[in-house]
């Protein structure tokens, strides 16, 4: 059984029933992302990706916050006083885990927004495949309130998930919105009362855990890449992903699914998965 107790200073990891619960652990700072946290999250994601007991990753925050964004003192004021090359390294670490690793992660990822979610936290939120928020969560793009535009890929995250007018409204005004509103505008898949958040997330994670991992990976990667390609390019690319998945799949899910549906008549693919 995977045991990551006390392995990282700013992140907690617990693997239960195939689900890796990754918790940003700076509650006294509303889980603001510091250079240390960014470095540790790179190690966390790379470690969990290779952990054969972890099939789905859930990202959340300790206490009453998902994350308040970047730590203004550690990430900005202290780093601003450092040599330029240090600033380059710090920015690279932030980008590496907040979107480069998460967006192309080999396993399904879910953001579980349990409270405050501000600024830079929008990058890992949107980089996760799916997201569930507590109704009571508070979201905000407050950068405008202290004199800068949204940093890193926050604007890109909004542009990819939220409509033009709504995205610009919150970027330009700095107003906050709730988890319920976030679900209506498409920033998260859905919202539930805080008291039901963990169970709802666990159920979704279990659903993903029980799917064929090779096929899930091909499906999510194909979707994310197809948005960047033309129709003609997509026809070639997505057929290639289909063929690749069949070649890499050790359990031959396509053959099993067809057999159980056409020959055994034990499943209805429109309503349920094949039996693995």
Model-derived segments and their meaning:
Residues 100-213:
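Crotonase-fold acyl-CoA enzyme core
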Residues 51, 105-106, 264:
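Acidic-histidine catalytic/liganding microenvironments
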Residues 22, 26, 41, 59, ...:
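Terminal peptide-recognition signature
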Residues 1-17, 174-179, 199, 203-206, ...:
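C-terminal alpha-helix plus adjacent terminal tail
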Residues 36-40, 94, 101, 200, ...:
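Charged catalytic carboxylate motif
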Residues 94-98, 153-157, 166, 218, ...:
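Hydrophobic alpha-helical segments typical of transmembrane helices
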Residues 61-100, 117, 145-147, 230, ...:
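Glycine- (often His-adjacent) and acidic-residue-rich active-site loop
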Residues 1-62:
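Conserved CoA-thioester-binding segment of acyl-CoA-metabolizing enzymes
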């Amino acid at each position: 059984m995977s045991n990551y107790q006390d392995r990282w200073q700013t992140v907690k990891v617990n693997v239960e029933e195939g689900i890796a619960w990754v918790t940003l652990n700076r509650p006294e700072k509303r889980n603001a992302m510091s250079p240390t946290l960014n470095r540790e999250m790179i190690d966390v994601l790379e470690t969990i990706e290779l952990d054969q007991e972890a099939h789905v990753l859930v990202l959340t925050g300790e206490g009453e916050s998902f994350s308040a964004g970047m730590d203004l003192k550690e990430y900005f004021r202290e780093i601003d006083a450092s040599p330029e090359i240090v600033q380059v390294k710090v920015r690279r670490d932030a980008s590496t885990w907040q979107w480069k690793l998460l967006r192309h992660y080999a396993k399904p990822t879910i953001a579980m927004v349990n409270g405050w979610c501000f600024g830079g936290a929008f990058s890992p939120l949107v980089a996760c495949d799916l997201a569930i928020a507590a109704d009571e969560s508070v979201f905000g793009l407050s950068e405008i309130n202290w004199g800068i535009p949204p940093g890193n890929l926050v604007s890109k995250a909004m542009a990819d998930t939220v409509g033009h007018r709504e995205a610009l409204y919150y970027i330009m005004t700095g107003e906050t919105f709730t988890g319920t509103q976030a679900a209506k505008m498409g920033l998260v898949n859905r919202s539930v009362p805080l008291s039901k958040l963990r169970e709802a997330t666990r159920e979704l994670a279990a659903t993903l855990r029980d799917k064929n991992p090779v096929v899930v990976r091909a499906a999510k990667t194909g979707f994310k890449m197809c948005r960047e390609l033309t129709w003609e390019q997509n026809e070639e690319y997505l057929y290639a992903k289909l063929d690749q998945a069949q070649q890499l799949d050790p359990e031959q899910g396509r053959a099993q699914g067809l057999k159980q549906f056409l020959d055994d008549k034990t499943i209805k693919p429109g309503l349920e998965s094949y039996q693995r």
